[in-house]
């Protein structure tokens, strides 16, 4: 009886091993398929070349890169060499007709504005007076010469 049990155990082990071998081959074939598919995709996108940005895509990219600063369509003075400025290349020339990277896009961003400092009350000029106070002051001084008579208003 013990021999039969051991034989049945060996038979189950053998069948289980064969099942695992088939399963391993199936898994490895699937992995090779996906690996080949990934390589094919990467190769075809690299052969396609760099992309260009035109129209709304260019504006969206500039808004993303520059954020709240805003951007210019032509380079502000002071960017690049003097020979480049003579050609008057703009963002469309550089990123629509050719490909450009993020650094090139960032060159067209407006400069960062320094935060406005709050002025103290002492530093304010008399012209900074609110309009209502100015009008009252003007009314009082524009009454003219009434002599010493007091008029109620």
From Swiss-Prot:
Cite the InterPro entries for this sequence: IGF-I, Insulin-like, Insulin-like_growth_factor, Insulin-like_sf, Insulin_CS, Insulin_family
- One MF annotation (Gene Ontology) recorded for this entry: hormone activity
Q: Where is the composition biased (Basic and acidic residues)?
A: 125-138
Q: Which Pfam families match?
A: Insulin
**Chain segments carrying region Disordered:** 119-153
Spans annotated as C: 78-89
UniProt keyword annotations, A-Z: Disulfide bond, Growth factor, Secreted, Signal
Q: Which cysteines are joined by disulfide bonds?
A: 54-96, 66-109, 95-100
Region feature A, mapped onto this chain: 90-110
Q: What is this protein called?
A: Insulin-like growth factor 1
């Amino acid at each position: 009886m013990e021999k039969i049990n051991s034989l049945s155990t060996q038979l189950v082990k053998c069948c289980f091993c064969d099942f695992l071998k088939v399963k391993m081959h199936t898994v490895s074939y699937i992995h090779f398929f996906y690996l080949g598919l990934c390589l094919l995709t990467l190769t075809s996108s690299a052969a396609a070349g760099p992309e260009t940005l035109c129209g709304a895509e260019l504006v969206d990219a500039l808004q993303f890169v520059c954020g709240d600063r805003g951007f210019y369509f032509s380079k502000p003075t002071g960017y690049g060499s003097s020979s480049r400025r003579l050609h008057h290349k703009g963002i469309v020339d550089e990123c629509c007709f050719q490909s450009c990277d993020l650094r090139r896009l960032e060159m067209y961003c407006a400069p960062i504005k320094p935060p406005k400092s709050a002025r103290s009350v002492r530093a304010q000029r008399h012209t900074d007076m609110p309009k209502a106070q100015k009008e009252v002051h003007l009314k009082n001084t524009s009454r003219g010469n009434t002599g010493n008579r007091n008029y109620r208003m």
